[in-house]
Regions:
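N-terminal periplasmic/intermembrane-space "pro-region" immediately following the signal or transit peptide
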Residues: 2-12, 19-155
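Membrane-embedded beta-strand positions of outer-membrane beta-barrel proteins
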Residues: 154-156, 197-199, 246-248, 292-294, ...
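Transmembrane beta-strands of outer-membrane beta-barrel pores
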Residues: 158-166, 192, 201-207, 250-254, ...
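Hydrophobic, lipid-facing positions within transmembrane beta-strands of outer-membrane proteins
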Residues: 178-184, 226-232, 273-279, 320-326, ...
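Residue-level signature of outer-membrane beta-barrel architecture
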Residues: 184-188, 232, 236, 279-283, ...
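Repeated loop/turn-to-beta-strand initiation elements of outer-membrane beta-barrel proteins
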Residues: 192-196, 240-244, 285-292, 335-338, ...
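Outer-membrane beta-barrel "beta-signal"
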Residues: 482-485, 489-491, 495, 511-523
Length: 523
């Protein structure tokens, strides 16, 4: 019935006179995106031209041939505009790429790579899922070696440079120098308990000797200086809430040229050694934590070698220090832990009287309060403020007391910039006649910025004071470092530093500039 209707319709339209049968209209697959010839094939279209014979040439007319070679989409335009080809009706218009936007890159053929075994690729049947490797935050950092249950890291820096005033003279006298600084760190990798070693040292040698007849200056002829700082800390986990804390420490060095302690006429600086230990217990009571420590330290000076070939004893500067320390802290909230700390100690010298007839034995201590914090790992550290005092047995020596501050803060400003702030205060011994001691305070700010992962720039600024009763010293310094990391093992380091000393004592002012370049080898 349906076919007869189609035939009747074609007859009415005169289709019976056509050489081809009448077909229904063919639609494209998508009405929204039509294409040429999508509705009906070109050869079956009723609107196609008939292949009639041209009466002029007698050759059948052929349609659909491409235009001649000289034809183009462009023609004459008085404004010299290019004629654009109009898109087929209904086709989507191409997206316009504006200025400054990257064009779509051309499609590239996939690379031909060698085949990888399923076990190596982690796609073998029955294989456990492979863990994704962590991104290395410091690709040029020190790796270290495992020795048993310890991770050991060692390094050495060899550098040289020029110091415009190594002796801290009022009238600068410069000298070239070299420095060798080894380091050794060992950290235990145990499930329980801990043992850590941190040992650093340096030796600075100068190629210049200074005259022995430098007036009343305390600068020796040879100013070569060693420096060693080491600490061994341990922890024994008795229970989940009880721990035994222990530590051994060592400090080797010489008197600072900026202090008035060195005597006149030295051939070289006498070396001192400060060593001691700590033993204590740490107990947790829920959020409350109590730590009690006992400390024993000893300070020893070697004999001073004078320019006339004789030696002078420094036994009056040797002393033992015994003390006890207690710290109470409370975990107020995650990342905030306030604390209170108290310490008491006594110092007993080897000789009752020093070289000027003063009794230097004393009792002292401090009380301070502060907090340790960690805010989303962007700001971490500890800050405390307190009060310290020291009473001397000799009534001629005044009590030494004052405000004490201590801080160690790290602020990660960005992923490339880190800011550090440090503060320290101490009550130190002195050899000046009639002076009880010195109260020292030091503050420093350090900014580290990674221009690249292998190029690190550092800027440091510092300020410090030292009070010797009537004498007041102020110290300033500014330093800039640049580290170029070649590999994880080798790095090149350059440094420029300038120091100022301003004192109310006549002739004690000084300034110096240090330029240094060296190589660091680490593993």
């Amino acid at each position: 019935m349906r076919g007869s209707c189609v035939a009747w319709t074609c007859a009415l339209l005169g289709a019976t006179f056509l050489s081809t049968p009448c077909l229904a209209q063919a639609l494209t697959s998508s009405m929204l995106t039509p294409s040429i010839g999508g509705f009906a094939p070109a050869q079956d279209s009723p609107l196609r031209p008939v292949n009639a014979i041209d009466p002029a040439t007698g050759v059948p007319a052929i349609y659909g041939n491409p235009p001649a070679s000289g034809a183009a989409d462009t023609g004459y335009d008085s404004l010299n505009r290019k004629r654009k080809t109009k898109p087929y009706p209904g086709t989507p218009k191409p997206k316009f790429v504006g200025p400054g936007n990257p064009s779509n890159p051309p499609l590239q053929a996939p690379r031909v790579v060698p085949p990888v075994s399923p076990s190596f690729a982690g796609i073998a049947e029955g294989a456990p899922p492979r863990r994704k490797l962590k991104v290395d935050g410091d690709p040029f950092g020190q790796v270290g070696n495992y020795v048993g249950g310890f991770l050991v890291k060692e390094a050495v820096e060899v550098s040289g440079g020029y110091d415009t005033n190594p002796g801290r003279f009022a009238q600068p006298q410069g000298s070239a120098f070299y420095r060798i600084a080894p380091e050794l760190q060992a950290t235990s990798d145990w499930t329980r308990h801990a043992l850590n070693l941190d040992l650093r040292g340096s030796f600075t040698g100068y190629g210049t000797t200074f005259p022995a007849d430098a007036g009343n200056s305390s600068v020796p002829v040879n100013i070569d200086r060693p420096d060693v700082d080491g600490k061994l800390t341990g922890r024994i986990d008795v229970t989940r809430d009880t721990r035994i804390i222990s530590a051994l420490r060592l400090r080797v060095g010489t008197d600072n040229p900026t202090t008035p302690n060195p005597q006149v006429g030295l051939s070289k600086y006498p070396v001192y050694a400060n060593f001691g230990g700590t033993l204590g217990v740490e107990q947790d009571f829920n959020r409350l934590q109590l730590q009690v420590n006992g400390n024993v330290d000893r300070t020893v000076y070697q004999y001073s070698k004078l320019t006339d070939g004789t030696s002078a004893s420094n036994d009056d500067r040797n002393f033992n220090q015994y003390g006890a320390q207690a710290r109470l802290s409370y975990d107020l909230m995650p990342g905030l832990k306030p604390f209170v700390e108290v310490e008491a100690d006594t110092r007993v010298h080897d000789l009752r009287m020093d070289r000027y007839g003063y009794e230097r034995d004393s009792n002292g201590g401090y009380l301070k309060g502060g907090t340790s914090f960690e805010f989303s790992r962007l700001l971490t550290g500890e800050f405390a403020v307190g009060y310290g005092l020291r009473e001397y047995q000799d009534p001629r020596l005044k009590r030494l007391d004052g405000l004490l501050t201590s801080a160690s803060l790290v602020w990660t400003a960005t992923g490339l910039t880190t800011v550090r702030f440090a503060a320290a205060s101490s009550i130190d011994e002195t050899t000046l006649p009639g002076v009880s001691g010195s109260l020292s305070r030091d503050y420093s700010v350090q900014v580290d910025h990674a221009f690249r992962r292998w190029l690190i720039g550092t800027a440091r600024f510092g300020y410090g004071t030292a009070s010797y009763d009537t004498r007041q010293d102020k110290r300033y310094f500014a330093q800039a470092d640049l580290i170029y990391k070649l590999t994880r093992t080798f790095a090149i380091k350059g440094s420029v530093r300038h120091d100022w000393l301003v004192s109310n004592d006549s002739g004690a002012d000084s300034n110096q500039t240090i330029v240094m370049l060296g190589v660091r080898v680490q593993r």
